[in-house]
């Protein structure tokens, strides 16, 4: 109850600051206010109101293109946050609305690097409704449609985007029981030293173990298991039941 009251107090205070600072005429302040409001409503479980706030936030960006960075990295990150929130609550029906905004953003920007990284994000959120439900036939078809615009240009991807692409591609191949292809993709997922502590990297290492097991690469399993065990033994590292289960198995 106290935490809920604290959040309510924070919300009231944020609204007061926005109102007293002439938020309507200030893009950055209004943007931050809308983003806070949407995240607050999502955290409070009012998903319908949160969705409306996300749409208002998107409209704000569309009406203030003169304030965008070049390329529009911040707008892209906002769209990614919205899509991630919708996926987290299983609201797949609203994802296409924001995917259309993402497609428009990709079409209008001239930077190849930005286009490819944004296309990777587009691919992921077209993929998740199928992947999350285990519809691997649709996943495979979607992969083929993105061969030219994404897979053939993966050299332009940031380390995180490339790692995400390789991980989800591996999961599709595992779902199709195509374990050799799964091993090929997950083996190419480099543990970049700049991002090796992200949860994504730990997921990649566990999926790599699964691919090695299915292809009977037992020496690689022993090597990778020892490496993961060493990293998990650090007092700074939080470990999860899934990790212990996979390593024990």
Features from the language model and the residues they span:
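C-terminal structural cap/anchor segments
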Residues: 173-247
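Alpha-solenoid helical repeat architecture
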Residues: 24-31, 66-77, 109-123, 153-165, ...
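"A position-specific structural signal for the A-helix of alpha-solenoid helical repeats
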Residues: 32-36, 74-84, 118-128, 132, ...
